[in-house]
Curated annotation (Swiss-Prot):
Pfam family, one: eIF-1a
Name of this protein: Translation initiation factor IF-1
Species assigned in the record: Caldicellulosiruptor saccharolyticus (strain ATCC 43494 / DSM 8903 / Tp8T 6331)
Biological role: One of the essential components for the initiation of protein synthesis. Stabilizes the binding of IF-2 and IF-3 on the 30S subunit to which N-formylmethionyl-tRNA(fMet) subsequently binds. Helps modulate mRNA selection, yielding the 30S pre-initiation complex (PIC). Upon addition of the 50S ribosomal subunit IF-1, IF-2 and IF-3 are released leaving the mature 70S translation initiation complex.
Subcellular location: Cytoplasm
S1-like domain mapped to chain residues: 1-72
Keywords (A to Z) from UniProt: Cytoplasm, Initiation factor, Protein biosynthesis, RNA-binding, rRNA-binding
Cellular component GO terms held in the UniProt record: cytosol
Quaternary structure, from the entry: Component of the 30S ribosomal translation pre-initiation complex which assembles on the 30S ribosome in the order IF-2 and IF-3, IF-1 and N-formylmethionyl-tRNA(fMet); mRNA recruitment can occur at any time during PIC assembly.
Length: 72
């Protein structure tokens, strides 16, 4: 899967789950289960409930995603 195939959406972190997983409420109302991308993990970016994030979704499974950016 190339970078052009992913869908990027914004949302708000609702809940922090074990193993660096997060429940994210997207702006369109859907909830997805997302994990932290490698670059955010490598740079020790902390993600807390209430943070605005950008999530990449695969077109094959729209219920899981990857958090690639955190804003305040």
């Amino acid at each position: 899967m190339s970078k052009e195939d992913v869908i990027e959406l914004e949302g708000t972190v609702i809940e922090a789950l074990p193993n660096a997983m997060f429940q994210v409420q997207l702006d369109n109302g859907h909830k997805v289960l997302a994990h932290v991308s490698g670059k955010l993990r490598m740079n020790f970016i902390r993600i807390l409930p209430g943070d605005r994030v950008v999530v990449q979704l695969s077109p094959y499974d729209l219920t899981r995603g990857r958090i690639v950016w955190r804003s305040k």
